[in-house]
């Protein structure tokens, strides 16, 4: 269900015209601190000094502030535990919205059934290391690597991921926070290690992903009507409420 598989498919298909094996950078962001969200603990650090009951009070206060008001999001996120805050980055629906769409869901089905055991292994680590840990064992393992492997193999292309070599993995696990994010720069240690090898314009270029403009496509009547007809004409009644 990752939209990035669309451009990845075409990149893999084109690459296969020229080579049989490719090297890819999967894992570098999770291991070396490449995601922008890993900078968040710095901005929220002052909240860590506030007693728990008062922090929860700030969260309740933020709920009554008008939507869009400056500082509302900061107060809310600062009042939350890392586990709840970081999971929220991946949430597309509130439980109420999800239940309206899929009435068979229940509050007992919680993301913590999956994440609690992973977070438990990172108790006592710094916040960024904990965020990286959850990403490695959910997002990286369950999405990124699966997607890359299946799409490249669908094009008879072999994918190698050198950043996930055991020696590299073990070295990255020993890095302190200030060698992951330094001077506002992500993946600082990795960039330093490669600066005599990789050209400057590549080393510090703007981060590029594989974005797919699905929202833009579906905003147009042709694609919207097509997608809606697929849903309404499908046998999906057992999965979700089509009227929602």
Residues covered by each model-derived region:
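Short beta->alpha linker loops
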Residues: 6, 26-27, 185
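Adenosyl-5′-phosphate
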Residues: 17, 21-23, 69, 73-244
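Short aromatic-enriched loop/helix-cap "lid" or pocket-rim segments at secondary-structure transitions
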Residues: 33-38, 217
